[in-house]
Curated annotation (Swiss-Prot):
Binding residue positions for substrate: 188-189, 221
Site (Transition state stabilizer): 163
Subcellular localization: Plastid, Chloroplast
Organism: Ricinus communis (Castor bean)
SUPFAM superfamilies named in the record: Phosphoenolpyruvate/pyruvate domain, PK beta-barrel domain-like, PK C-terminal domain-like
Cofactors that this protein relies on: Mg(2+); K(+)
Protein's UniProt name: Pyruvate kinase isozyme G, chloroplastic
EC number in record: 2.7.1.40
One GO molecular-function entry: kinase activity
Tissue note: Expressed in developing and germinating endosperm and in roots.
Pathway note: Carbohydrate degradation; glycolysis; pyruvate from D-glyceraldehyde 3-phosphate: step 5/5
């Protein structure tokens, strides 16, 4: 179904990761000051005691720890523990539902980042040719290298997005993002494991790091949380989307709003509308941001100057790419208009949909440059994405040109004619 519409919709498989969850409970209402006890004994479900799915849970917590339930919706203070039970007092109460996520503030569970279940899901992704993996609770770069080695052995061309949601990941941010193909700011668990006032600063930092390495970055969790139950968002949620867009996120993501919310389509429309409006109101700088990690690279120089030209002349950019690299470089500089990225590789088309400002389009390339240019312009005219008489900036750069064997680089401006 993802490929049934003219829009390019990529598929990302989100691994479950090493989550610690409570078992099934009779939905008790936890009240401040009452005793409540997680236990590693299986099948326990009473008003004051519930099983957890992690055998080392008792060993991981110490007296004085704060347990956060369901992303911090409720909290428990650890008072004492036995060999199989943690005795707690409720600090912030609420209704406890079955299979809620448990975090220890400031700590991560000593579990492998990729569980046995995750490996099964990853194999499913290989068999079904998903476009991205989102790997949960990544603590260091080792797990990214491990997954990439597995994908290499499987001959699977799938990119790895790391979810930054663990306290242990923060000291290793640079190496984790460097090893990955992109990052997701998963603010729910990040705000549970770290003080919540740190989350906006970390969001900005992660976006900045990804930009410097020319990796895509997604901002996720609680963006339109109120729309799970209500048809309109809070004004703070609207501002949250706008801030993520202004900070330079490549994508913003919904989860509970569309997974089990009452208004999934409305939530998507709100997010889409706010993101577009925010982008349209952003000031256009003729000179793009400073060059990034590959500033000595010929391709980066061309992307930089193509962006200056497009912004100065107020034109969209058309790029022809086999590998996607030039489209990625152009996206890094965030030109004011759309980047139409033509590629003759389906996998590249799917991958480029994640990058900010890029509209990927599949098209077979001709060995003749003029024929290729003309076909691309006609296709955009037919789709209503260009109008006759406007100008476009054409970019072709790289060691794998689209119409001959030797390396070629050029930028040109053309007037669209039918």
């Amino acid at each position: 179904n993802a490929q049934s519409h003219d829009n390019v919709v990529s598929i990302m498989l989100d691994t479950k990761g090493p989550e610690v969850r409570s078992g099934d409970v009779p939905q008790p209402m936890l009240k401040e000051g009452q005793e409540f006890n997680p236990t590693i004994r299986r099948g326990v479900s009473t008003q004051d005691t519930v099983s957890v799915n992690y055998d080392d849970f008792v060993n991981d917590v110490v007296v004085g720890d704060i347990l956060l339930v369901d992303g911090g919706m409720m909290s428990l203070a650890v008072k004492s523990k036995t060999s199989d039970l943690v005795k707690c007092v409720v600090v912030d109460g609420g209704e406890l539902k079955s299979r809620r996520h448990l975090n220890v503030r400031g700590k991560s569970a000593r579990l492998p980042s990729i569980t046995d279940k995750d490996w099964g899901d990853i194999k499913f992704g290989v068999d079904n040719q998903v476009d991205f993996y989102a790997v949960s609770f990544v603590k260091d770069a080792k797990v990214v290298h491990e997954l990439k080695e597995y994908l290499k052995r499987c001959n699977a061309d799938i990119h790895v997005i790391v979810k930054i949601e663990s306290a242990d990941s923060i000291p290793n941010l640079h190496s984790i993002i460097s090893a990955s193909d992109g990052a997701m700011v998963a603010r729910g668990d990040l705000g549970a494991e770290l003080p919540i006032e740190e989350v906006p600063l970390l969001q900005e930092d992660i976006i900045r790091r990804c930009h410097s390495m020319q990796k895509p970055v997604i901002v996720a969790t609680n963006m339109l949380e109120s729309m799970i139950n209500h048809p309109t968002p809070t004004r703070a949620e609207v501002s949250d989307i706008a801030i993520a867009v202004r900070e330079g996120a490549d994508a913003v993501m919904l989860s509970g709003e569309t997974a089990h919310g009452k208004y999934p389509l409305k939530a998507v429309r709100v997010m889409h509308t706010v993101a577009l409006r925010t982008e349209s109101s952003s000031p256009v700088n003729t000179t793009p941001p400073a060059q990034g990690a590959y500033k000595g690279h010929m391709g980066e120089m061309f992307a930089f100057h193509a962006t200056i030209m497009a912004n100065t002349l107020n034109t969209p950019i058309i790029v022809f790419t086999r590998t996607g690299s030039m489209a990625v470089l152009l996206s890094h500089y965030q030109p004011a208009s759309t980047i139409f990225a033509f590629t003759n590789e389906e996998r590249i088309k799917q991958r480029l949909s994640l990058y900010r400002g890029v509209m990927p389009i599949y098209m077979e390339f001709s060995s003749d440059a003029e024929e290729t240019f003309s076909r691309a312009l006609q296709l955009l005219l037919n789709k209503g994405l260009l109008v006759e008489g406007e100008h476009v900036t054409l970019v072709q750069s790289g060691a794998q040109p689209i119409w001959r064997q030797e390396s070629t680089h050029h930028i040109q401006v053309r007037k669209v004619q039918n």
